[in-house]
Amino acid sequence: MNSIQVKNEPMLASFASTSTNGKAKRSAKPSLFSGSEVSSDDDEEKPLAKRPKVEDSDSDAPLTSTVSSQNGVQKRSGSSNNDDNDDDSDSDSDAPLTALVKKSNGSDDDEDDDDDDDEGDDDDEEDDDDDDDDDDKPLSKSSKSNRKPPKTMSITGSGEKKWDVLIHKGPRFPDPYQPLPKDVKLKYDGRPVDLPWQTEEIAMFYAVKLETQHAQNAIFNRNFFDDFKTDLKKYPPRDGTQIKSFDKLDFRDMYNYWRSLKDAELERKKALAPSARKREIEERKAEETKWKICLVDGVEQRVGNVNVEPPGLFLGRGAHPKAGKVKRRISPGDITINHSADHPAPQPPAGMGDWAEVVEKKDVTWLAYWKENINGQYKYVFLDATSNFKTNSDREKFEKARKLDTVVKQIRRDVNKNLKSKVRHERQIATIVWLIDNFSLRAGNEKGEDEAETYGVCSLRCEHAQIKMPDTIHLEFLGKDSMKFEEDLKITNPDVFKNIAMFLKSNGMKDKSGNYVRKKPSDPIFCAPESGSGKMQPLQPNSVNQFLSKYMKGLSAKVFRTYNASVTFQGLLEQTEEWLKSRPNAAEREINQTNLRLAYNEANRQVAILCNHQKTVNPMLLNRNLERTQDKIFQIRYEIMKEQQKILTFHKVSELKKEFKVKEHPFMKQFDKIMQKQDLDAEKVKQYEEQMISDKKSKLESTFKRQQSELQYQLEQKGLTGDDGTPKKGKKAKNVEEEVRSSIKGFKDKKQVDEELKALNETAKRLEKERKTNKSQATSCNFVSSAKKILSKYEMIKKQEAELVNKNNTSDVALSTSKLNYIDPRITLAWLKEWDDRLSDLGQGKAAPKKKVKKEEEENDIKPKKKDAKGAASKKRAAKTGLANSTGDSEKMELGLQVMNISQFFANALQKKFKWAASGDDGRDISAKWVFVKDAQSKMRKLDSAERKGQKGGSMAAMTDAADSKEAQPKVNCVLKKQTSADRKMSKPIKAVDKTEESDDDLSSDSSDDEDKPLAAVV
């Protein structure tokens, strides 16, 4: 097979990166690992690796001889077809397969190429693709001496033809690197270093992260410097500088230059006329659309993320060991294109060489793939989430999870039976399935030493677990994407608890003396002897899926997670009204849109915790949120103080109490609160008022500049300016100019702006006088109005404080991941319809006045009006046929809601992705009575972790547990509480095994047989 040379060097505009011979190769089909696609869509298309089948014929034979690699070791045959292999992927198994897959973890979340990753909203987790396909991949060997390169297969699909004609433009490349000006240099030991552009670019990767949390990470810095030194050997400084110490590097000049470019671009955009800015955006979107549209069998389909990831530094998620390593620039010579052979293939950018290969694979749906250098993952360009391929995949995934409901009782009965099996392998599988089912843990994989050490149930080591009598297991390990999992799991099934304690102690094998071999901390909890060496290796997730597939074709651990997440979510939403009634104050108990959204988010939060959907905590963002909230609260308290000042200037407290009786004025019950002194720092009040006036002046001046820029731009477009840019004279030109002025929203001339600036100066003087005299300069005061304003502002403070608590409680919980990948969207839509009908019945169905105001404002806006009644046709069709979503009139779903706003629950991207969900099982518009499963509340899963991530006021699940504590299946009896760093510090050190004599006695006291003793290992 011809080899393809992967170009790791970054490129200049004039630098062409090619394959080995400088031309595109039509080589034999390259071998690939399974990897992740570029887009943030669900990875359901990625195929699973072919797996070796474990023969179970002698699984119950005891191991009576000494531990060795000779006879008595279980043999593994080659890969064989089974149900799990046939249908374990929830959709198109069309990405390249491998015979043995190196587990690729730590999907990079650093698509940005600057420090804006720390400035965005951390709740934007739609790019967190949380598939568990990795659960089904075979394990890599952990032994350094025995590790071999993985064997691979050629590109293969599912065998089923997906398309006849596929035409697209290929992936889009990032801009080439532009060298720095000669006066901007990296400094070493205080002296400028003359770097060639290849290493200068890598230094710039670090410079742009200088003011982020990443630059404070020792692992990040070490990995960067290691890669930087490697490149310095290839492209050393031209002035001969020897760079040996990271601490002597100074990136400040490079950062300042980059920051100046960012600031200049921001100022340029601010200076643009609104119409010019809008036109610029439209042109950019039009250019992007050329890349984002492809033809599949003559039908236009949207493509997902077509952009090749730009080079930079790998950020990773969690405590990723490869954070800071250099992501190399991808060239056309690294990319394979999938395209119709009878149509011209897309051309790579000029001067960058040819594609590695162009193929025609009609049984796959990827458009292109390439390999990234950090984790060896293959990244793919797929169609967009709204494409037919993806929407069908999503529906099939959730329908498979619904089908599980028909066999789940039988599975659980058999699991409970196998927990007491004499066959160790069966008992291990049953214990694993019980943990996956009850705690929604991932099956997981062991990693090689060159990969991020992350784990799931199957690959857990003894050092990850600690027995806590009488019924608790403490687990602490790095989960998917290097996110830390640390929980105390209360095991309600005594057999499970006893099994785990047993598996922690021994693998069932005996030494020469006939004693059971005690496990070491690094030994796997669930294990079987490896073929050939006899060494105990973690049980493969494939073993779990083989067990599950006996009950339903394609059933895997991930389907269980999807089923439990959706069932629990439905069960929680069914308790919405009860949860609202349980809220601590009257305002929170009201049935309205705001409180319903809080109830929905509470259910979403609990399911996210159930699935252990974490996200990287950004301390800088948390601090900014805290500062912003504190500033908002100070502003509100300042406004309260000014109202109080006004009241005390015009009224006496004693007279107010006499004049305004509680009977006629109920708000007087809170009179003491109304007049409570705010105790604001005088200097801070002065600074706030001065800043407030300054901000208003700046806003007024910037608005004036923007309006003048808009006026100039529109006159230029109409040809009414001279060569010097000044407006033309003449009656006609003047009339047109007046029309343009009137079309600009809120247009003010220079005279009006000067008058307002003068008024602001007067306000500043008035505020200064009020500070000195502590008397209001207002002309009058309406006490009732001021009192009600003060009380409303106290409520605003409560909301701000509650929002801050909510953000802190969910700072490490990825709410959107479960909604995107694990919760059937039809549950949300049916719930929305139900409550929309109820709110309409309560008289809350009238349109909000805000929309009318918006339309009136748009008449005077410079921007073109939006299309009115975009969904009117769909609503009329729905009224007649019940099929509002049967045609492609809109990319988003049409539910015909009168009160509830779907955008508050599903962002536009999710509405497009889940448009299929607006139709029920009968193909008609989804009904408010649609359910994922019947009797969901009795099937909800347990959630111990939420007991420490509780939210004051209780949770829906806590009510479920209190209402029916007799259910055999434990429910989500929890409240949510954010775990603090102090909580973690109080945790006891992890032990491989609880070796106390009391533990051994407790484990054996309730059994008359030898179930508590280590079972014989399979041979």
UniProtKB/Swiss-Prot annotation:
Residues 386-860 form the Topo IB-type catalytic domain. SMART domains: TOPEUc. InterPro entries: DNA_brk_join_enz, DNA_topo_DNA_db_N_dom1, DNA_topo_DNA_db_N_dom2, TopoI, TopoI_C_dom, TopoI_cat_a-hlx-sub_euk, TopoI_cat_a/b-sub_euk, TopoI_cat_euk. Transmembrane segments: none annotated. The active site is at Y822. Coiled coil: none annotated. Signal peptide: none annotated. Residues 864-879 have a biased composition (Basic residues). Residues 379-380, 442-447, 556-558 are annotated as: Interaction with DNA. Residues 1-160, 716-737, 843-890, 940-1019 are annotated as: Disordered. It holds the Pfam family Topoisom_I. Releases the supercoiling and torsional tension of DNA introduced during the DNA replication and transcription by transiently cleaving and rejoining one strand of the DNA duplex. Introduces a single-strand break via transesterification at a target site in duplex DNA. The scissile phosphodiester is attacked by the catalytic tyrosine of the enzyme, resulting in the formation of a DNA-(3'-phosphotyrosyl)-enzyme intermediate and the expulsion of a 5'-OH DNA strand. The free DNA strand then rotates around the intact phosphodiester bond on the opposing strand, thus removing DNA supercoils. This is DNA topoisomerase 1. It comes from Mycosarcoma maydis. The lineage of its organism: Eukaryota, Fungi, Dikarya, Basidiomycota, Ustilaginomycotina. The gene is TOP1.
